[in-house]
Amino acid sequence: MAKVNLIESPYSLLQLKGIGPKKIEVLQQLNIHTVEDLVLYLPTRYEDNTVIDLNQAEDQSNVTIEGQVYTAPVVAFFGRNKSKLTVHLMVNNIAVKCIFFNQPYLKKKIELNQTITVKGKWNRVKQEITGNRVFFNSQGTQTQENADVQLEPVYRIKEGIKQKQIRDQIRQALNDVTIHEWLTDELREKYKLETLDFTLNTLHHPKSKEDLLRARRTYAFTELFLFELRMQWLNRLEKSSDEAIEIDYDIDQVKSFIDRLPFELTEAQKSSVNEIFRDLKAPIRMHRLLQGDVGSGKTVVAAICMYALKTAGYQSALMVPTEILAEQHAESLMALFGDSMNVALLTGSVKGKKRKILLEQLENGTIDCLIGTHALIQDDVIFHNVGLVITDEQHRFGVNQRQLLREKGAMTNVLFMTATPIPRTLAISVFGEMDVSSIKQLPKGRKPIITTWAKHEQYDKVLMQMTSELKKGRQAYVICPLIESSEHLEDVQNVVALYESLQQYYGVSRVGLLHGKLSADEKDEVMQKFSNHEINVLVSTTVVEVGVNVPNATFMMIYDADRFGLSTLHQLRGRVGRSDQQSYCVLIASPKTETGIERMTIMTQTTDGFELSERDLEMRGPGDFFGVKQSGLPDFLVANLVEDYRMLEVARDEAAELIQSGVFFENTYQHLRHFVEENLLHRSFD
């Protein structure tokens, strides 16, 4: 089937006035290949050229004024090819001096008694405006050239095309295209939305702020609705082929295992286990996200599920993003299972004969549980009968990597885990097809981490506080943003310099260094020494952000903390507070921006990862929250997942109703269905 367009044009781009082969090349650099692409190339922002009352204008602000010329323009030249044009306007009985630099040609355009509109910076004291643009009115009415003066669209452009040119070309295209409605009359009426014709014309050429808001709302809903149609359709397709073998686990053995644990499960952990067990008994594959704050006990929940699979005769796999984390998981699971399960570790460091034996044991079923990095998805890793695949910190893996692991078994159940609590808005979008279990309770006996913020000049005082903890027999982390010094970031501390400084302060043998450039063996050696209390202070980059578990560590210093986002800071902070001892986190930062100050303030106010994730999303946006490529999110042109989260929920409900009821597959939705199928359904946003 040919590509289905919802916007159709009788012309190609080359047939539009003003577009030749050179312009085509520039447009293609902007990813504009067809007239449809041009019409959907929306402005990134709007210049508000609304004429302002000078009595209300703030000093040194950018304003737009309209007045009558009462002195002839005068041009003075100075320097090398520089000029200054001066003209006086009467603006509502206020005499205003207008200055235009390096625009001498305006002298021929500006006439006495002419009404003009000027945009520029206002000097209230001098009653003077430094103009950067002027619009000419013809006998008191706006010319076509100035038709967009009030709300002027601004597009992302490249060298070879000007704003006015792309505006004119879009105006041409809109006059000739046929626009098929993307939403039904029923939906538009239900949510008071506009037609797509009105919406696109208004987004490109708004006549008022009110019209622009209505158009933006309609287009945002449309984007979210199309995205959710895709998500719901994929979900339907996946479930239709998601037949699974019921996992007939031995509940008595599972209960006995839980009773033998050296601690009592929290209610949140029990609830999550029950939700997962219900999925395992269902006739379709499990797709569940288990999210919990740092230290909330997700690994124990995973362990119980793995044990259940073992009692049913199935293997389990756990894939994590780093070797350090894989080793820690393997160590903790071996301790939990004892002799009841055969746990193996597979990373890139496992080679030769050891790897060969491990793979043989995996294929013949001797290994019950395999833990590892992306090494698990290699072709020669063959399971005997894997029934459960768990991916930890799943947003750090691409969709393809996660899918390859899942395909290791014919009817494998899938559990994703994350210690980065997903904001509700992103959970709906990225994991809309999954069920979500959340652990918001910390294990009994844990004390909230005391977080404080200190300026750089207070470093010595922080060092004394850390020394006090070390004297109690505790351990500490010191985190830096850089491995080595950078000429571009001279004011940012680097981990090597701080490591050497602390070695002089505490002694060489008491301080360890960890960063991403070390080999796997070197990292293992350092972590082993820290875990065994051979090292008191670990100086590190964010390589310790996830999973590292040393209960005796009770102090964390994060240097240049304003260089990190809220979620990263919270993950780092979660490396302490993993015992019943009081833990401390000190943020050393002298932020120069409002955002940096806000992050430091928020971190000292709450230790709730779910609250922090929402604030982080608000501050950074969805693309930066996960990293654009890993988020699974499309680049919405108008919709904003933070501002439009209620709209997202409505769009999801409407899409789910259409797909699940089967109405979407009737003739009424034929055009829209073909569009989603041909343009969106199998598109990867990864």
From Swiss-Prot:
Q: What is its EC number?
A: 5.6.2.4
UniProt GO BP: DNA recombination; DNA repair
GO terms of molecular function: ATP binding; ATP hydrolysis activity; DNA binding; DNA helicase activity
Superkingdom, according to UniProt? Bacteria
Residues reported in the UniProt entry to bind ATP: 292-299
Q: List the catalytic activities from the record.
A: Couples ATP hydrolysis with the unwinding of duplex DNA by translocating in the 3'-5' direction; ATP + H2O = ADP + phosphate + H(+)
Which residue ranges does the record annotate as region Wedge domain? 50-149
Q: Where is the Helicase ATP-binding domain?
A: 279-439
Gene3D superfamilies registered for this protein in UniProt: Nucleic acid-binding proteins, P-loop containing nucleotide triphosphate hydrolases
Q: Where is this motif: DEAH box?
A: 392-395
Q: Which residues form the Helicase C-terminal domain?
A: 462-618
**NCBIfam families per record:** PRK10917.1-3, PRK10917.2-2, recG
- What is the stated purpose of this protein? Plays a critical role in recombination and DNA repair. Helps process Holliday junction intermediates to mature products by catalyzing branch migration. Has replication fork regression activity, unwinds stalled or blocked replication forks to make a HJ that can be resolved. Has a DNA unwinding activity characteristic of a DNA helicase with 3'-5' polarity.
Subunit-level organization: Monomer.
Q: What is known of its domains?
A: The wedge domain within the N-terminus inserts into the replication fork junction, where the lagging and leading strand split.
Q: What is this protein called?
A: ATP-dependent DNA helicase RecG
Q: Which organism is it from?
A: Staphylococcus aureus (strain NCTC 8325 / PS 47)
